[in-house]
């Protein structure tokens, strides 16, 4: 009687194994309907991430806000808690507040000079920094009530941004 029961169990296990073997040969593994995490799109510039307002950060398209992206791109950056917003520009993170001239930038602050631009002195100062050797950030102080302002460049690798009103600070993005 035990022998019959043992043969029945072995036969049952053999049939189950044959069914799994046959189903594996004729029915290949199917992809899941929804992946756990969607694949990240690689990019070099923001234009590569046109869809849904994404920006290129660290070589991948992401919806990361500008402040988080700056912290991701620039390891060890110390942002002043008063700085609560920034905007993406093609080559820079542009902050709504700026560095204090007495900050750790110290001697690295280079006064480029007074600029006259009736449209946007900030954009002009930014483009000058992008073409100035060693410039890692810029600041534009508009002279009250005029279309002129002072443009400053900075050369420190990890700026510690300090709060100050009526000026704009920007640091370069790591664009691949």
Curated annotation (Swiss-Prot):
Top-rank taxon, per record: Viruses
Spans within the Intravirion topological domain: 1
Transmembrane segments: 2-22
Virion surface side: 23-176
Keywords assigned by UniProt, alphabetized: Early protein, Host cell membrane, Host membrane, Membrane, Transmembrane, Transmembrane helix, Virion
Signal peptide: none
GO CC annotation, single: host cell plasma membrane
Bilayer topology term: Single-pass membrane protein
Subcellular location as annotated: Virion membrane; Host cell membrane
Inducing or repressing factors: Early structural protein.
Disulfide bond entries: none
Annotated family: Belongs to the asfivirus envelope protein p22 family.
Protein name: Envelope protein 167
């Amino acid at each position: 009687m035990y022998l019959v029961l043992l043969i029945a169990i072995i036969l049952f296990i053999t049939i189950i194994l044959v069914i799994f073997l046959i189903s594996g040969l004729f029915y290949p593994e199917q992809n899941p309907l929804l992946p756990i995490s969607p694949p990240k799109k690689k990019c070099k510039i923001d234009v590569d991430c046109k869809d849904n307002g994404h920006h290129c950060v660290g070589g991948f398209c992401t919806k990361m806000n500008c402040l988080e992206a700056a912290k991701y791109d620039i390891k060890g950056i110390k942002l002043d808690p008063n700085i609560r917003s920034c905007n993406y520009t093609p080559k820079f993170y542009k902050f709504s507040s700026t560095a204090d001239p007495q900050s750790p930038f110290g001697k690295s602050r280079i006064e480029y000079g007074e600029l006259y631009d009736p449209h946007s002195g900030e954009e002009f100062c930014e483009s000058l920094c992008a073409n100035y050797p060693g410039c890692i950030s810029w600041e534009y102080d508009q002279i009250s009530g005029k279309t002129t302002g002072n443009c400053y460049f900075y050369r420190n690798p990890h700026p510690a941004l300090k709060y100050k009103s009526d000026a704009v600070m920007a640091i370069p993005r790591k664009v691949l």
